[in-house]
Amino acid sequence: MKRFISTTSLRVLSNLNKNNNNNNKFNKSIVGVFNREFSSSNEGLNKVNFGENNNSSTTEPTKVLFNDSQFYQEDKYQGISKEPFSKEIVDTLLADLNPDDIEIKPDGLIYLPEIKYRRILNQAFGPGGWALKPFGPPVVEGKTLIRPYALYCLGRYVAESIGEQQYVPNSFISFATATESAKSNALVRCCKDLGIGSSLWDPIFIRQWKSEYATERWCENSKTKERRLFWFLSNRSENQLPYPWKESDFNQVPSNSSYSSSSSSINNNSNSSNNNNNNSDSSSSINQPQQETISYHQDDSSSPSSKITEQQDDSEDIDIDDVVPPQLKKYAGKTWRQLVADPKGLSYLQWASSSFDNAPKIKSQATAILEFINKSQ
């Protein structure tokens, strides 16, 4: 049966530059050019052109990404969907994952290590009962190394995929390591067709697993002082974030410039007769939520004044761990402490203190917290 077939050809051009000393040495610069050619007839594959070098009489043939002669032929798909595997194999492939085997990246993406896929394949088909066959050599396109693979189990075609890995020549990762990483990437993609780890793409399972086995924590960049929320395993033994990120206690209210916690007193406006007590209170920083209350006044003119201690009957206290009002939509569901810890939180408070004329209580709270932070610096 004749059909239209497209091929992806890779032209490798070699620029031969003679050395000034005429020692016949030359430098080769390899440039990959991808041309997608579509057949306009029923004769099958187009003929592959050869790249010519204007600087030299030597020529090199064009390499094809999928250069296996059987890549587009039916023989490649031997035994495809012929019959299902035995029940014993199916039970092994579709078994529930061990929650302890699942890992999570700082951005919240959960995954199963590649070695786990290999172990499941070995348990289902036995060592030697499956293989990942490459079709074509590894090719570097831009800053990515790619290579196509097909997965065979018990002599039957199962799935195919293109593995990829970021790679820059003369970088910290070698060509061999990048090729092996691309192979592992292709294996994981092929295993999806066998149902291995299919729950990792199920949104319901992802939410349930995160709620039980992962936690989100504040981390700080030790160089830029930027703060972000990263995901960790709940049962982790230590912080695994790479430098310059480190886990930070978001309970500490940062200053306006350095976002570091201030050790100034919460009760620094108390009576002068209790100086000794005030000195001991000043050592208690703002990372003690049960002692943090910010008092503010609200009058008809909507001009609140921040106080650190309870002074008058018409004042109200703000707990730094209270949830912010829902009108502050950007931080809805978060606490005042989390708002202040955010790098953009202070500017947001400044905006809120000058807005919300129709909600004087929110305006008063934002102003009170701003004044409290300024006094704590």
UniProtKB/Swiss-Prot annotation:
It is found in: Mitochondrion matrix, Mitochondrion nucleoid. One of its GO terms (molecular function) is DNA binding. Residues 1-12 form a transit peptide. Keywords: DNA damage, DNA repair, DNA-binding, Mitochondrion, Mitochondrion nucleoid, Transit peptide. Residues 255-287 have a biased composition (Low complexity). It holds the Pfam family Mgm101p. InterPro entries: Mgm101. Performs an essential function in the repair of oxidatively damaged mtDNA that is required for the maintenance of the mitochondrial genome. Binds to DNA. PANTHER family: MITOCHONDRIAL GENOME MAINTENANCE PROTEIN MGM101. Belongs to the MGM101 family. This is Mitochondrial genome maintenance protein mgm101 homolog. The lineage of its organism: Eukaryota, Amoebozoa, Evosea, Eumycetozoa, Dictyostelia. The gene is mgm101.
